Every structure is written in structure tokens, then in C-alpha cells.
């Protein structure tokens, strides 16, 4: 049974494969993996920057992802090489794996969005070749970060930080999916002046905030500041999120695709999806509605899994 701590004075993960405060950290499996992450993200943004192939929102997102992941990975390597984990302002038990999970999801999204919405519309030539190569290195980075998550996640019977457990990793996934939902509903006309759809947007926002607060509490090692026991907080949060998303999974598709509510059940009925209207790197309204419906279902499954796994955790204080 997985074991986690609500508060700890230990600053390094017990499952770390690196030698803390030594150059040998770079020769251990986890250190070599982080070097691969560092190199692949650096090469990805360097290739794109050298030809300026990152204009527009999709290109900007990809460039931000690679630069951000490179910078934070470099900070983690410096911390471990210098043995500065005790001085790090965040919980070292929780920070590396939390970042690795976010980085894997960020790089995955860039590896999909960048080539499908940007690269394929570039003319053949040096810029396109560099963009394709950058996408390849983005995929490598995604695999490297996912491998780190697999290596450092909690094992049955192991004492570790909450973010290394399945519910902790699910919190990262839930917040990431919510951010994608927010991107798709950035067009207010999709839900304004329709109370049922506005309720769905409120659900996405409330659940995102609660999950993000959980992540921040663990990163700051502040779970003891809650007015209620942390396990109770987690169980209540997961149950509330499941109930809220259960309403959204019914209301959003119903009011977006049912003709009884003046919606378009087929893509061809939405004028914003006509070829003459949609720009190459834009998503039409019907596709946005469908994407949000799918992502709502995915996040509901994540919250259900979160609720189930949370009941299997044993919390101890050391």
C-alpha cells in the first residue's frame, strides 16, 4: 500500500537515483536522464529560434514549453550538483516529480500541437526542416520526462512525498487538462447567456483552483496549515470534484449538440467551420465544443481515479 507524509523534515526523496551534492549525480541514471532532458529541450528551442519558426500562439506555446522546461531542469541539476536541496524554497520531496510530470505533459502537447497547427503549413525549406527536427527533440524530451516520473513515483510501502503518489500525479494531470479546457473555451460566445454552460465553466474553474491549491500546499510543505486533516481535505476535494464534473459531463454536450437547445449536432451545420472561414492555425467553434466534451470526460475519469486511490493512502508524520 502506498505511504505518504503530510509533513516532513527530510529534503531529498528516498528513491532518488542521484548522489546528492556531488558531480557523480550526473553519472547516475536519473542524472543522465536529466541531462537528456536538458539537451533535447535546448536543441528544440535553438532549432526553432535560429529560423524564427515560432510566430503565432501555437509557436509561442511550443517555444515557451521548451525554454521553461530547459530552465527548470537546469535549476534542478544545479541544486543536486551543489547539494543545495535544503536551501530550496519548495519541498524537494515533491518538486522534482511535480515538475517532471508537468514537463512531460507540456512537451507532449507541444509535440502534437506545434506540428499539426503550425509546421504543416510552413513552406518546404530550411525553416520547415528545423521545425520538424525540433518536434522530434520535443518528443524525446517528453519521453525523458515521462521516464523520470515512472522512475521516481511512489512504490507500495514506500515513504515519500504526496506528489509522488498516484493521487498527487493525478492532481497534476487534472490541472493540466483544465488549462487545455480553458484554452478551448476562451471564446465567450461558446457559453455566455446560457446558465447551464456558464455553470460548466464555473465547474472547470472551481475544480482547477482546488487541485492547484493542493499542489501548491504540497510544494510549499504547508499541508499542516489546513484547518482540517489533510486526508479529509483530499477525500472531500476528490468527491466534490467528481460530483461537479458529473454535472458538467451531462450539461455541456447536451446544451452544445442538442438541437432542442438551438445547438448544432453536426460539424457541417456550424458556419464557423466552413473552409472559407477557418484559418490554418485556428479551431472552429464546433471543434472547440467537441474537444471540451472529450476533455470533460477525461478529467471526470481522472477525478474518479483520484477518489479511489486517495482512500488507499496511509498518512504518517515524521
UniProtKB/Swiss-Prot annotation:
**Pfam families recorded for this chain?**
MARVEL
* Xref: InterPro entries: Marvel, MYADM-like
Lineage at the top is: Eukaryota, Metazoa, Chordata, Craniata, Vertebrata
- Family designation: Belongs to the MAL family.
Q: Origin organism of this chain?
A: Rattus norvegicus
> Which regions form coiled coils?
none
Single GO BP term: negative regulation of gene expression
UniProt protein name: Myeloid-associated differentiation marker
**UniProt keyword Iron-sulfur present:** no
Q: Which cellular components does GO assign to this protein? A: cell-cell junction; cortical actin cytoskeleton; membrane raft; plasma membrane; ruffle
Q: Where are the transmembrane segments?
A: 35-55, 58-78, 95-115, 131-151, 165-185, 197-217, 233-253, 290-310
Q: Where is the MARVEL domain?
A: 25-157, 162-315
Q: Where in the cell is it found?
A: Membrane
